[in-house]
Amino acid sequence: MFAHTALRQRCAKWLFATGLFLLLGACVEKPSTLERVKEDGVLRVITRNSPATYFQDRNGETGFEYELVQHFAEDLGVKLQIETADNLDELYDALGKPSGPVLAAAGLVSSERRKAQVKYSHPYLEVTPQVIYRNGRPRPTNAKGLVGKKIMVLKGSSHADLLAELKKQNPGLEYEESDAVEVVDLLRMVDEGQIDLTLVDSNELAMNQVYFPNVRVAFDVGDTRDQRWAVAAGEDNSLLNEINEFLDKAQKNGTLQRLKDRYYGHVDVLGYVGAYTFAQHLQQRLPKYEKHFKSYAKVEQVDWRLLAAIGYQESMWQPEVTSKTGVRGLMMLTQRTAQAMGVSNRLDPKQSIQGGAKYFMKIKEELDDSIQEPDRTWFALAAYNVGTGHLEDARTLAKREKLNPNKWLDVKKMLPRLSQKQWYRQTKYGYARGGEPVHFVANIRRYYDILTWVTQPQLEGQVAEGNLHVPGVNKDKPADQSPPM
């Protein structure tokens, strides 16, 4: 009997302990999304592969969205892990899956059809949806002009939502949604006449138009809209709150503005004829000198594509050019600079590239240590054009105006003042054509962007072999070579 009683007591204690353990376990709170990210030490992000969002070049990962989300990961003190989606449905569906991405950073616009799936962040970039057509074809000016046209947009996109709304007032409007294309593909299809029209956001057109010289804006559709990040609707708000705090801070401290300037502050400088001409020269002239750019870039430890962009801005890759001021050769060196860099024949493209590379890096190394990348590169380019003395004058003016003398975004505002008497009389080195280095830097940045995009690893070697298809450059000339209005 005593044995049975003892057994019952032990069982009761065991059941009590087990129940207490389960009860306590149930009371332990599940870690929040933000806590899980910090515990894992990794921020898993899904995005799209395009010039306006994210792509990989020979130096690694880059893109507006990539850099912005990298700043966020650094704020959290975690590593960034990127994956790309083939289409928007795949991107949205990936959020919330176990061990999947917790954040979508892909230039998304809030969509009613997605609100059951995701929660959107505060805005960080304002864009305008635009109807795109091919130059030389009839230009639609309103929604009625879309009827009877072959239109394609990204499947599940906010542009598809816009067309659905327009169709209510224009029943004859038909369009195709595709999950097999990206924005670059849609613009190429318009450029080559495969489709009549597409819809894209203004920032993506700005980044891509230079590759497709025939595309034009027909008209803007509706009001401007905001791009946002997204998290899964089923997640708690801890990560979303942190994202919103970060984006608000980035807006106030200038991080967003610097990124906008870096990626969008120079995209409209080429114009139609310039874009078409550059694309032709990319195929016809660059292959002759590419090995020299690569060789001396390696010696000087600089990106060869940046050197090539400087060379194109200076001479359009023509080795025998001479200006009215006496600068000569592919890199347009002065006699004094050529002598200092050990160049005996400025018209020899190999020597010119060697001298230009050496001179550019000399300028860059002599800049004030307080100037950090990427601004350091833009400053060096400006000094390559106008001289370090005038650049320092512009930095001094920036200080007087309570601007940041170490940021290109601020200093480029001061450079044009060097041609105005009321300003240059206050400087050490006096008058300069200060607007020139601003355009010089903007052009080189744009050429560099294009070279970076077309020399991605999967396209390696095709430029040199003459096999690279540069969008907008076919055997036939474009329909109209007049600049866009």
Curated annotation (Swiss-Prot):
Any one GO molecular function term: peptidoglycan lytic transglycosylase activity
Subcellular localization, as worded in the UniProt entry: Cell outer membrane
Segments of this protein annotated with the region LT domain: 268-485
Active site per the UniProt annotation: E314
Annotated catalysed reactions: Exolytic cleavage of the (1->4)-beta-glycosidic linkage between N-acetylmuramic acid (MurNAc) and N-acetylglucosamine (GlcNAc) residues in peptidoglycan, from either the reducing or the non-reducing ends of the peptidoglycan chains, with concomitant formation of a 1,6-anhydrobond in the MurNAc residue
A Gene Ontology BP annotation from the UniProt entry: cell wall organization
Ranges in coiled-coil conformation: none
Membrane topology note: Peripheral membrane protein
Keyword annotations of the record: Cell outer membrane, Cell wall biogenesis/degradation, Lyase, Membrane, Signal
InterPro entries, A to Z: Lysozyme-like_dom_sf, MltF, Solute-binding_3/MltF_N, Transglyc_AS, Transglycosylase_SLT_dom_1
One Gene Ontology term, aspect cellular component: cell outer membrane
Signal peptide from the UniProt entry: 1-29
Top-level taxon in the UniProt lineage: Bacteria
The keyword RNA-binding is assigned to this record: no
Function: Murein-degrading enzyme that degrades murein glycan strands and insoluble, high-molecular weight murein sacculi, with the concomitant formation of a 1,6-anhydromuramoyl product. Lytic transglycosylases (LTs) play an integral role in the metabolism of the peptidoglycan (PG) sacculus. Their lytic action creates space within the PG sacculus to allow for its expansion as well as for the insertion of various structures such as secretion systems and flagella.
Family as reported in the entry's similarity comment: In the N-terminal section; belongs to the bacterial solute-binding protein 3 family.
PANTHER family: MEMBRANE-BOUND LYTIC MUREIN TRANSGLYCOSYLASE F
Record note on domains: The N-terminal domain does not have lytic activity and probably modulates enzymatic activity. The C-terminal domain is the catalytic active domain.
Protein name: Membrane-bound lytic murein transglycosylase F
Annotated organism of origin: Pseudomonas putida (strain GB-1)
